[in-house]
């Protein structure tokens, strides 16, 4: 991320990526400019023609957009923030919650979860059991 200091970064307006930039003042202040785009695809097109030096977006969105475009973009190993997602159950559905938890752990242990993630997201982005 330090290599982006003094550069211009694109971001989808109103996205969680924009919030991540705003919540990381050291990074935000190091940039020459932040260019807002209506959508990530437009930001990536601007990156391709050199309008911005980088684009900040959610990892899943980045993997999907890059894989579909076939462009030679690189995703940095460093992140600005981490987001957590959860599965919601009704309060009295304890048995269902426990069954889903057990199955997710089993799938993580046997590698099924990683295979699914690779297929649909282009990378093993799983956190279950880690």
Task: Give the role of each language-model region.
Residues 34-45, 83:
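Short helix-initiation/N-cap motifs at beta->coil->alpha
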Residues 17, 59-120, 123-130:
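Periplasmic-binding protein-like
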Residues 1-8:
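Flexible hinge/capping segments at coil-to-helix
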